[in-house]
Amino acid sequence: MIDRVSFIEMSARQRAQFLLDKGTYRELLGPFDSIMSPWLLDQNVVPQADDGMVVARGTINGKNSVVIAIEGAFQGGSMGEVSGAKMAAALELAAEDCRAGKPVQVVLCLETGGVRLQEANLGLAAIADIHAAIMDVRRYVPVIGIVAGTVGCFGGMSIAAGLCSYLIVTREARLGLNGPQVIEQEAGVQEYDSKNKPFIWQMTGGEIRSRIGLADYFSKDDAEEIKKAVSNFIDKGNPKEFRTDRYEEYLERVSNFDTSKQADTRVILSLFKQ
């Protein structure tokens, strides 16, 4: 019998409520405000009242905090104009508070396939705003990302995950710039079989991402363990060096890779050996 609470099985709203101190949860632009995407109905897609994005203010260990959680169950957590604007604006407001001497801790729950195809360039523009806002606010407080599963984090939002000060992943998580189906479509099934689940998790799963240094904490699907990791990273403050500061090192490693050979877990581990 499992004696722990699953973080993966929580909705975005439940995740935000769980991470914030009890009784402090206050949602901004929630479902009753009906800030919905204006583009989906015309494409025969039923919109959601919060556009799949939960922004909640409260405290974590008594410190003012904002938790921004993507609902992976709505359109695969895809980022549209409204949902992207909600996240970007929340990050920008947190940065403004920090500059005013009122630091706000930032936690991102990332379950997303990337840009929402029905909104195309509007979603891409929103993701660019999110990247800029993360870079801004992380100068003052750590930005803590969580990729728990089962959607994973792909596309432009995987870059957002890489910009976070700290990243928490589970075994069920996946993290990659392109999703399995996209790679298979472009490179062929012999290069990347999207139906081969063990292979997919060996290449992009939370465990391998943690082992090669692209994530900072590898957790069980245990809500309390994840909450404790968030608390510890908040207390720790920003790292001395962000992953993005090491971009030249990563580029050199990738440029020296022989792309004529099929990559596997062993190759990835040797390529990104710490």
Can you annotate each of these PLM segments?
Residues 1-28, 34, 184-274:
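Amphipathic alpha-helical segments at domain termini/boundaries
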Residues 32-43:
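Short Pro/Gly-enriched beta-strand edge/turn motifs at strand-loop
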Residues 44-62:
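N-terminal short beta-loop-beta anion/metal-coordinating cradle
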Residues 51, 80-102:
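A short, well-ordered alpha-helical element
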Residues 60-85:
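STAS-typified acidic loop motif
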Residues 66-70, 104-113, 144-148:
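Glycine- and acidic-rich phosphate- and metal-coordinating loops
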Residues 97-121:
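A glycine-rich phosphate/pyrophosphate-binding beta-strand-loop-alpha-helix module
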Residues 113-242:
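Conserved catalytic cores of soluble enzyme domains
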